[in-house]
Amino acid sequence: MIRNPRLRNREQANNRHLIDPYPVHTLKRVDQPTTRINEAEVFRQHEQTSGFYRAGRGDFGEHMQQEYRRFVPKYPLSGAMVSMAGALADLVDEPVGMGAAGMPDSAVPKNMSWAPMGQVAEKKAPFTDNPEKMARHIKETAYFLRADLVGICELPVYAIYSHQKQDGKPIHLNHKYAIAILIDQDWHTSRQTSGNDWISNSMSFLAYSTSGFIACMLADYIRRLGYPARAHHAMNYQVAVPPILLWAGLGEMCRIGDIVLNPFLGPRFKAAIVTTDLPLAIDKPIDFGLQDFCAKCKKCATECPSGSISDKDKVMYHGYEKWPVDVDKCTKMRIGNKQGSGCGVCIKVCPWNKPNTLFHRSISWTMRKLPFARRFGVWGDDLLGYGKPDYNHKWWLDLETINGDLQVPNSSKNR
Ligand code: SF4
């Protein structure tokens, strides 16, 4: 088993022209995402319509409003991660009126010689006008910063939120390109968890905070090359992530509602985005047979503890043809979970949630290429016991902060 998800595979090591850690060059590329999108019907969403925002506002009652404030920090590790992610909230774009190292202009010493932090450089850097070379360079830079997968697309206008969550102000974003950065939530931990125990939120925030950290640095780097760029991460989005992932060739929409599923990571990742005007060659959407696979599998719908995921057919919703999901039920489950912190059972049980080993890459290839094998794939997944927690290797501590005290919860699997 490859424990380090960042280890590049042997194929890449032997082919220096391959820059991606996963064999994305083997995927079938298509002109349109496999999810039908009726662009005339897609409207730009107000970010305050999200389930979590509504919970924090009190739309689901006082108890949920209180739980919303503690459902991540009630577990000490996810609390540490959300603090770090929060520190990145104001580092997404060039600071207004700030100088070097984030100091106010008035406080910057006159003899300071380096470029002010985060500003778009006045002169464009040499060698930045070739879109093919720059796309390759930006991907290599993101991988150097420890991204797991990267894709690039033109930014669809309908992916831009209409209004900000923080202050409700209208969003004016006119960047041409979007760079999507995926971070794996860790297979080693995913194998052990039930999906809704005490490590669940930490897996999410590992990927939220890391992808946000990389996006903020990448956006700052691009601004230093002389082009506008803004990072978008869990603590400060101006764009909806799923349509960008579809167009950037990083996955297909799956049965788990608005979730995009990647052929190498499954749904076990979180993403951050950089939008920019730096000229970049774009990727194309991918088709690995997921629409057919999800139509047959339905494992997430069966296992979802809140019954939020439908086992029925797709419907047209806000211009997307997708499987419906009950966002309110899902939000209440994740916030109100008394047996753990958060919930990701759908991610845990998905047959595409596998390690990057030769055996699993072979199975994945078969599922992608041979439609008749897909039913056997779901059956074999159950037979081999994937989807069940493996607490024999559990590494984390079960703890819950209650009224300021750390306690061992009744649901603890500590051994
Ligand atoms: Fe699709 Fe099955 Fe994964 Fe659900 S569990 S997203 S139906 S492949």
Question: Which sequence ranges carry the predicted segments?
Answer:
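Intrinsic-disorder/low-complexity, polar/charged segments
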Residues: N130, M134, S209, F213-I214, ...
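Non-catalytic, usually N-terminal nucleic-acid engagement modules in DNA/RNA processing proteins
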Residues: M1-S190, G195-D197
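Low-complexity, intrinsically disordered regions enriched in charged/polar residues
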Residues: Y75, V82, I244, H360, ...
